[in-house]
Amino acid sequence: MRYDGRKNNELRPVTMDLDFITHPEGSVLITVGGTKVICNASVEDRVPPFLRGEGKGWITAEYSMLPRATNQRTIRESSKGKISGRTMEIQRLIGRALRAVVDLEKLGERTIWIDCDVIQADGGTRTASITGAFTAMALAVGRLVEKGALKEMPITDFLAATSVGIDKEKGLILDLNYQEDSAAEVDMNVVMTGEGRFVELQGTGEEATFSRSELDGLLELAEKGIAELLEKQKEVLGDVALSIQQ
């Protein structure tokens, strides 16, 4: 039995509250157990200089964490005057993941800014951010299609992410909370599409190694969890989800 009473192959409770913030074109508060992330999608009718005149759009992301999202207060990165390597890595991961499931030419010369702000952290903030960011982006793009700004849906597939790991006593586990993540011998983040294709794998051993069979087991576990997250997205997105599936 895990710390919170879950089975090894069980996700934490997941909710997605749409339009949590009223101003963005798409907004979602995603809650995964004790982790809560506000994901906003904002649309600009312009692209970065390197894409001007190319007839393509762009999707980029920013990620941050409130000072008291964690057990002890952390200093805001804006106060430090620089972004940490971890933050930069997560921002790039979110942007890459979202671009993998969007036809940027169909998006046209516009930019979708994704802002993921962690208001409470209990493990899996980057994977929750990706899952919530996709949902917010789908909301925003669906509204562009609805009002005629886009002729067709540029999102080609669904996208979600989760974490898996190996605990010395419990074995393979899905969706690690902070306590489990801190103690895990192996920790892996997995990003997948609705068709079951991989976008990104980030896996490391902490003073430990893992076998090919364990890797296969981790991926199977992640696939199960992501399938459940995808169903949750489809449930909350309603008609927008149907337009992506067409």
Curated annotation (Swiss-Prot):
Q: Does the keyword RNA-binding apply?
A: yes
What interactions and quaternary structure are annotated?
Answer: Homohexameric ring arranged as a trimer of dimers.
Cross-referenced NCBIfam families: RNasePH
Write down the species.
Answer: Bacillus licheniformis (strain ATCC 14580 / DSM 13 / JCM 2505 / CCUG 7422 / NBRC 12200 / NCIMB 9375 / NCTC 10341 / NRRL NRS-1264 / Gibson 46)
A Gene Ontology biological process in which this protein takes part is: tRNA processing
PANTHER family, per the entry: EXOSOME COMPLEX COMPONENT (PTHR11953), EXOSOME COMPLEX COMPONENT RRP41 (PTHR11953:SF0)
Can the keyword rRNA processing be found in this entry's annotation?
Answer: yes
Q: Which InterPro entries match?
A: ExoRNase_PH_dom1 (IPR001247), ExoRNase_PH_dom2 (IPR015847), ExoRNase_PH_dom2_sf (IPR036345), PNPase/RNase_PH_dom_sf (IPR027408), Ribosomal_Su5_D2-typ_SF (IPR020568), RNase_PH (IPR050080), RNase_PH_bac-type (IPR002381), RNase_PH_CS (IPR018336)
Which region is the signal sequence?
Answer: none
Entry keywords, A to Z: Nucleotidyltransferase, RNA-binding, rRNA processing, Transferase, tRNA processing, tRNA-binding
- EC main class here is transferase
Q: What is this protein called?
A: Ribonuclease PH
> Which of this chain's residues are annotated to bind phosphate?
R86, G124, T125, R126
Known catalysed reaction(s)?
tRNA(n+1) + phosphate = tRNA(n) + a ribonucleoside 5'-diphosphate
Q: Which family does it belong to?
A: Belongs to the RNase PH family.
EC number of this enzyme: 2.7.7.56
Identify the SUPFAM superfamilies for this entry.
Answer: Ribonuclease PH domain 2-like, Ribosomal protein S5 domain 2-like
